[in-house]
């Protein structure tokens, strides 16, 4: 497929707000695409690079290059060239990348150049494109949309399912099953303002401790154990304690969902930064394990003895979990019969906070496991308002922060796929955080205008705030009150950041 075709469709999709039109455009594109093009086409349309960060800044992309008069670049050719750019390292790498990018831009038409610049700077972003692409694939291939969605959920990759569908037709979907050793995207929770609100919405439910650790998915098949993060990265070698714990469990073949935590000598949780550092340590795992020992806490079972449990109600999944996992390795919880039993939920929340944990997750007892989705049957409650936002820009600091990128411009996901700025903050940052974020944001920089450095919207940061107030200064019409940085969430992607819609729904007093 020619890049020009993709660039034109991307422009048309961005220009229409009608979901049906977006689906039709993508369906037509997929019908014309070769199966081997799709693993490139889908991330390009969503504004993602399969290669990840390439170290290409605005200075390289801003150099004027005479465009080609006729389109000749294919998407696979572009992908290969960008892979080559990313492979340039060492002395003179900047010049080498600049030369390769110049050659690529010279082979691109003006429309293709604009698309490539947007792709490389993070400006090509389509709202909820993966969900629309599922519908487009279904329409293009004649497969039921629900079957395509389930296959994507089980494969953990839209590109993998799309390639199989286009190569083999709807029958290929039968090959996507929940399989030990192949991770699936985890179910996520929406936010509720209080325990009473959550119990009122869900009725009979389980109120579980919300642990401030790293989400893990544990797979065991006999003596073989694999451990995956929420982004499906394999971290088995970094967590020998979890492998040992898995081999002690009663079952022989299962998939469990849980959290990795670390406790201090008093049994209270250690900081998220310590746990993240431990899980991220690849060099001396033994030393890291001695310094920050971790343990698993499980809260769901997805598969047991080859039996897919995803569609079963939570009560049945938890019964299977309890059969396999001893109580000390299961998350603490309280069963609540409904709103009339709200006092029990409030008591459990207070006890959870007293134990040093960050809140609770309230789960409907009759709900299935919605892998890869933020299900309405899971509601998290934290006493402090927090949001996962995306850093859009940062400002060079003054005084003791001279030379450091300090004041963060914060954005939430808007309905059209862009990021709506909600305000700025320089509060809550330690010296170590300032040093780290300056280095990280410099890598993401795409433009510098005076003291403001615009960055690719890739870095997620957890922000605490005291509330919302109306503001005509920002596109969503609101801004955060007393926003401060809690921590960076490199374990989350921008697609997992909070939305403007969710934020406004959580503060009806401001939007009335």
From Swiss-Prot:
Its cofactor is Mg(2+). The active site is at 210 (n6-amp-lysine intermediate). One of its GO terms (biological process) is DNA repair. It is an enzyme of class 6 (ligase). ATP binds at residues 208, 215, 230, 259, 299, 374, 380. Pfam families: DNA_ligase_A_C, DNA_ligase_A_M. PROSITE patterns: DNA_LIGASE_A1, DNA_LIGASE_A3. One of its GO terms (molecular function) is ATP binding. Transmembrane segments: none annotated. Its EC number is 6.5.1.1. HAMAP family: DNA_ligase. DNA ligase that seals nicks in double-stranded DNA during DNA replication, DNA recombination and DNA repair. Belongs to the ATP-dependent DNA ligase family. This is Probable DNA ligase. The lineage of its organism: Bacteria, Bacillati, Actinomycetota, Actinomycetes, Kitasatosporales.
């Amino acid at each position: 497929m020619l890049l020009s075709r993709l660039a034109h469709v991307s422009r048309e999709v961005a220009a229409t707000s009608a979901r049906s039109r977006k689906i039709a455009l993508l369906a037509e594109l997929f019908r014309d695409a070769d199966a081997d093009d799709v693993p490139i086409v889908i991330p390009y349309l969503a504004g993602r690079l399969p290669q990840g960060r390439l170290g290409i800044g605005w200075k390289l992309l801003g150099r004027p290059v005479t465009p080609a008069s006729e389109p000749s670049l294919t998407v696979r050719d572009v992908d290969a060239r960008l892979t080559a750019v990313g492979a340039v390292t060492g002395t003179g790498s900047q010049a080498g990348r600049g030369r390769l990018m110049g050659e690529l831009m010279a082979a691109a038409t003006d429309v293709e150049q604009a698309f490539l610049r947007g792709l490389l700077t993070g400006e090509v972003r389509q709202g909820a494109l993966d969900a629309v692409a599922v519908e487009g694939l279904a329409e293009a291939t004649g497969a039921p949309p629900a079957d395509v969605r389930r296959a994507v959920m089980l494969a953990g990759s839209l590109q993998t399912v799309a390639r199989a569908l286009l190569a083999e037709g709807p029958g290929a979907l039968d090959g996507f099953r929940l399989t030990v050793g192949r991770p699936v995207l985890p179910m996520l929770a929406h936010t509720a303002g209080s325990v009473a609100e959550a119990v009122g919405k869900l009725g009979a439910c389980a109120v579980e401790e919300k642990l401030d650790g790293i989400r893990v998915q544990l797979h065991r098949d006999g003596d073989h154990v694999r451990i995956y993060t929420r982004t499906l990265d394999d971290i088995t070698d970094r967590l020998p304690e979890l492998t040992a714990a898995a081999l002690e469990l009663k079952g022989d073949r299962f998939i469990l969902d849980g959290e990795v935590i670390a406790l201090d000598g008093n049994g209270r949780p250690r900081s998220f930064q310590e746990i993240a550092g431990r899980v991220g340590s690849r060099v001396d795992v033994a030393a890291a394990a001695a310094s920050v020992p971790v343990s698993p806490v499980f809260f769901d079972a997805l598969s047991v003895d080859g039996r897919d449990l995803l569609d079963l109600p939570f009560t049945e999944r938890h019964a299977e979990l309890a059969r396999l996992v001893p109580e000390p390795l299961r998350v603490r919880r309280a069963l609540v019969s409904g709103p009339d039993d709200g006092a029990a939920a409030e008591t459990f929340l207070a006890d959870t906070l007293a134990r040093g944990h960050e809140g609770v997750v309230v789960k409907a007892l009759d709900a299935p496991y919605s892998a890869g989705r933020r299900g309405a049957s899971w509601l998290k409650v934290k006493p402090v308002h927090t949001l996962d936002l995306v850093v859009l820009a940062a400002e060079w600091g003054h005084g003791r922060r001279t030379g450091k990128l300090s004041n963060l411009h914060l954005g939430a996901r808007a309905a059209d796929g862009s990021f709506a700025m909600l305000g700025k903050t320089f509060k809550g940052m330690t010296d170590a955080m300032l040093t780290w974020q300056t280095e990280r944001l410099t890598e993401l920089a795409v433009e510098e205008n005076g003291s403001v450095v615009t960055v690719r919207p890739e870095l997620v940061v957890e922000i605490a705030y005291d509330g919302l107030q109306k503001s005509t200064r920002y596109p969503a019409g609101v801004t955060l009150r007393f926003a401060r940085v809690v921590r960076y969430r490199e374990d989350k992607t921008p697609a997992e950041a909070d939305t403007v819609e969710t934020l406004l729904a959580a503060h009806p007093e401001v939007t009335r």
